[in-house]
UniProtKB/Swiss-Prot annotation:
UniProt keyword terms in alphabetical order: Chloroplast, Membrane, Photosynthesis, Photosystem I, Plastid, Thylakoid, Transit peptide
Lineage per the UniProt record: Eukaryota, Viridiplantae, Streptophyta, Embryophyta, Tracheophyta
GO (cellular component) term, any one: chloroplast photosystem I
Descriptive protein name: Photosystem I reaction center subunit N, chloroplastic
Organelle transit peptide: 1-27
Organism: Zea mays
TM region positions: none
Family under the similarity heading: Belongs to the psaN family.
Membrane topology: Peripheral membrane protein
Task of the protein: May function in mediating the binding of the antenna complexes to the PSI reaction center and core antenna.
Top-level taxon: Eukaryota
Main location: plastid
């Protein structure tokens, strides 16, 4: 009864080849993504570490004196794009590393 219902929905008889081919194609795509992920692991770890340091620095920029008025008038993020602000400038540079020119997230306008 179940087989007849499935055949009716698809308009043709199912066989193992269709299912295997689909599963194989999905496995190939998965393997490709896994390889890309492994290849980018070192860069991604570096980016996470830089972001962690930058987030800490953002919380204390005024207290540490790295982003004080009047230089931070438009914000410490903008100041870090213009001059060296510890941790934040490094994070902004690393964000674009390994990416195409127009895919640098928040930094797309100042990197080129």
């Amino acid at each position: 009864a179940m087989r007849n219902a499935i055949e009716g929905m698809n308009g043709k008889e199912l066989d193992g080849r269709n299912i295997t081919t689909t599963g194989s194609a999905k496995a190939t795509i998965f393997d490709e993504y896994l390889e890309k992920s492994k290849a980018n692991k070192e860069l991604n770890d570096k980016k996470r570490l830089a972001t962690s340091g930058a987030n800490f620095a953002r919380a204390y920029t005024v207290e540490f004196g790295s982003c004080q008025f009047p230089y931070n008038f438009t914000g410490c993020q903008d100041l870090a794009k213009q001059k060296k602000v510890p941790f934040i400038s490094d994070d902004l540079e690393i964000e674009c590393e390994g990416k195409e020119k127009f895919k640098c997230g928040s930094n797309v306008f100042w990197k080129w």
